Amino acid sequence: MKRKVLAMLVPALLVAGAANAAEIYNKNGNKVELYGKMVGERILTDRENGEKGDNSQDTSYARVGVKGETQINPELTGYGQFELDLEASNRHNPDQTRLAYAGLSYKDFGSFDYGRNVGVAYDAEAFTDMFVEWGGDSWAGTDLFMTNRTNGVATYRNTDFFGMV
């Protein structure tokens, strides 16, 4: 009986889309973290006008990334992140880099980074981008106009408006 429950539980956990992280190194103000996520999903669609073929699509994927930071001095921190998106079916799109940036964070003045990152307009939209599927696609689903991930973007972020909020 226990084996049957375990045999059903393990695949369910793999398909559930769990995200995990592991701290690889943390010493003297230097930190490196490895993280990942696996999602198993299939979309069923209706075919019209007698179209032939499978009426489902495998949209399973895995994401793996590494991020790190180093304390340069008590007020200045360097940080970076790299994240890769791996599609299970890989039929239409090759594996792609989701994030790849490096930057500096100053204690009282915010942070500045450069690379492939989410644009600053996404910060406002991120509060509503919580859906399981197709969330925020109405205006933030592209790699343009700083509304989602984009290449070669320099971003400045400040969380407390220079200590006034």
Predicted regions span which residues?
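Alpha-helical architecture
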Residues: M1, A16, E69-I72
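Serine/threonine-rich low-complexity intrinsically disordered regions
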Residues: M1-K2, N93
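Sec-dependent signal peptide recognition
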Residues: K2-P11
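Sec/Tat signal peptide C-region and signal peptidase I cleavage site
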Residues: V15-E23
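Outer membrane beta-barrel
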Residues: E23-I43, G53-V165
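Glycine-centered low-complexity coil/loop motifs and glycine-rich tracts
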Residues: D46-E48
